[in-house]
């Protein structure tokens, strides 16, 4: 979404009591770093070992799961003011499939398995759902944990208006 939009989004989410880093300063000119950038208040926590931390017992894991689920549910229910909607591109299943077909057509060779998968996706498209704000990369590596609790959700550069099942899918992917 670009750093300016990400900065504005973090300000908005912080005002709604989301567990995100507090944005402090936007340097559009790149005076401080040589490139446009923004600064945030440090959020205590680490994303390492969320799934494998031996210090987390079953009750800790249940509470952490509740914390994460609460934040994600709150995000997907959030009403975005019209002046904030301009920050986001709308995405949907069809636009993703179209983009994949376009990329596939640019290749100098064919990939029949990918073509088959795209046809399957077209035929088995999920039921249309209401669109909501999505993180776009909701996974363990973007969740900060400290003292067995969720302290922050970071890396909002892929945020968009889309199907909330995208975030759930990212979170459930075994590769994280």
Regions found by a protein language model. Give the residues of each.
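Active-site acidic catalytic loop and adjacent metal/ATP-binding pocket
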Residues: 23, 75, 119-166
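Residues that line or immediately flank small-molecule/substrate-binding pockets and catalytic motifs
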Residues: 27, 157, 172
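Short loop segments at secondary-structure junctions
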Residues: 43-44, 147-149, 176
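ATP-binding pocket architecture of kinase catalytic cores
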Residues: 1-95, 99-117, 124-130
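Short, function-defining helix-loop hinge/capping sites that tune catalysis or transport
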Residues: 14, 49, 143-145, 163, ...
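Active-site activation/catalytic loop segments of kinase-like enzymes and analogous catalytic loops
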Residues: 166-176
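Glycine-rich, phosphate-binding/catalytic loops in enzymes
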Residues: 56-57, 152, 169-171
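Active-site micro-motifs of SAM-dependent methyltransferase domains
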Residues: 45, 82, 140, 145, ...
């Amino acid at each position: 979404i670009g750093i300016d939009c990400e900065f504005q989004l973090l300000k908005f989410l912080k005002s709604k009591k989301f567990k995100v880093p507090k944005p402090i300063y936007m340097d559009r000119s790149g005076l401080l770093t040589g490139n446009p950038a923004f600064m945030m208040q440090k959020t205590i926590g680490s994303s390492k070992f969320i799934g494998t931390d031996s210090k987390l017992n079953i009750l800790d894991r249940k509470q952490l799961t509740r914390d994460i689920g609460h934040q994600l549910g709150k995000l997907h229910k959030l009403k975005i003011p019209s002046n904030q909607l301009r920050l986001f591109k709308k995405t949907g299943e069809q636009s993703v499939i179209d983009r994949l077909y376009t990329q596939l057509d640019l290749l100098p060779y064919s990939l029949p398995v990918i073509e088959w998968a795209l046809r399957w996706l077209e035929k088995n498209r999920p039921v249309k759902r209401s669109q909501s704000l999505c993180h776009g990369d909701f996974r363990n590596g973007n969740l900060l944990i400290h003292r067995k609790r969720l302290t922050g959700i970071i890396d909002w550069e892929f945020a968009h208006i889309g199907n909330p099942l995208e975030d759930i899918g990212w979170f459930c992917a075994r590769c994280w």
